[in-house]
Amino acid sequence: MAQQMSPGQHGSECIHDNAQSHLPPYVDCDSAGFRNNRSNLTLKFSSDFEKAQKAMEFCSDVCAVYFPADLDVVFNSEIENELAVDICEWRFFPCFSESLKRLAISMSRLSSLQIDLSYERRTLLHHHLVWIFLMDEVCERLPLLGLHDTMERKYLENLKNITMDLPIEDLNQYKGICPDDLLQVALDVQRILAEDLMPLKRALLEESHVQKCSETLCLFFDNQYEEGKIFFKRPTTHQIMSTRGYTIGTNMVFLLFLQTPMVDLYNADDPGLVQLSILVALFHDFIGLQKDLDSLKQDCDGSVGLNLVRVSMQESGHDEKEALQTVVRRLNSYCHGLEFFMSAYTPLCKQLYQEILKFVFALYDYHLLGATESSNSRYGWHRVSDYKA
């Protein structure tokens, strides 16, 4: 397990003028940024919308993300470390590949976000985050094997039935057709949902909350199937967008950390929540572009052709840097606009969106830093503290 790092290991940190601000130290820090192993582009964060937008006008090698100043994105290192220990003792942990084990440990950071949530609820959230990566691996590989309309359909139907406590079909009928390792992953995914996630939800959440979780998860499965149909069809941005707000999976994560009053307001088809999920998808595709391009060459993941940044490059004729800056400008404009419109919401609705937006930016942080503020090597980005504009 990664050990907690001391502040000195990151070099000099920026101190915010507002002592009450709980912005991550890389926000509004002129000397801090992130670079990818495969590019000289620098990613920076600013709580000043105009400054972020202008930074990209003056420098083609910078992407400046707007980070709203009133978001409390803080993580609890004690909880993070405890979750990291506990996930290693989870009975399903031995089922994971070495890379997924490392990912599971790093996700303890995301599950330690400073919010009003019991440790048991955090454990459920942590298990779900790990499970969704395992579940998605099956959906990414089956279309490459020509099994989308057969085994994948049955796999997703089984998962839906598990959420509704209905019988499932035995996937072993595909033994000899599907590689043994992938078949075992699919079986493990079903077991974790049936034996761990659903029992935890029923034990920790109110019945109406569990019902919303199941409905949202089934919507996710339905869109996963629809998305699999276009893996090899050179889809347009508009075709991808019709499912991506659901298949990015964040609506389910939102539900797992919300408290009852806000859960009552939650609607998986709420256009605003779908847009926030697209926000996550755009940043995910931004941060994962190089990884997806590598996977495309290796032909090991059918979903990489759906990367919205890559598709926008094909449609617009932009080079990589232009496409990345365009995506970031879109992210910034949406967030800035949302802040304005939220002022007209009811207090509870505003709180719902504020909490979800906080988690969106916690995801940004996780994608870049991973566990204990180190570096999330999954996407090839690393922190640089000596950047000069």
Curated annotation (Swiss-Prot):
Sequence motif DDxx(x)D/E motif, residues: 136-140
Enzyme Commission (EC) number: 4.2.3.100
Single GO term (MF): metal ion binding
Motif (NDxxSxxxD/E motif): 284-292
Binding site for Mg(2+) 1: D136, E140
Reactions the enzyme catalyzes: (2E,6E)-farnesyl diphosphate = bicyclogermacrene + diphosphate
Ligand binding (Mg(2+) 3): H284, G288, D292
SUPFAM superfamilies to which the protein is assigned, alphabetical: Terpenoid synthases
Coiled coil location: none
Primary enzyme class: lyase
Effect of H284N: Reduces the sesquiterpene synthase activity
Keyword annotations from UniProtKB, A to Z: Lyase, Magnesium, Metal-binding
Pfam hit, one: Terpene_syn_C_2
Binding site for Mg(2+) 2: D136, E140
Result of altering F286 to I/L/V: Reduces the sesquiterpene synthase activity
Domain remark text: Contains several highly conserved motifs that are important for catalytic activity including the aspartate-rich 'DDxx(x)D/E' motif and the 'NDxxSxxxD/E' motif, both of which are involved in complexing Mg(2+) ions to coordinate the binding of the isoprenyl diphosphate substrate in the active site.
UniProt function note: Catalyzes the cyclization of trans,trans-farnesyl diphosphate (FPP) to the bicyclic sesquiterpene bicyclogermacrene.
Family as reported in the entry's similarity comment: Belongs to the terpene synthase family.
Official protein name in the record: (+)-bicyclogermacrene synthase TS4
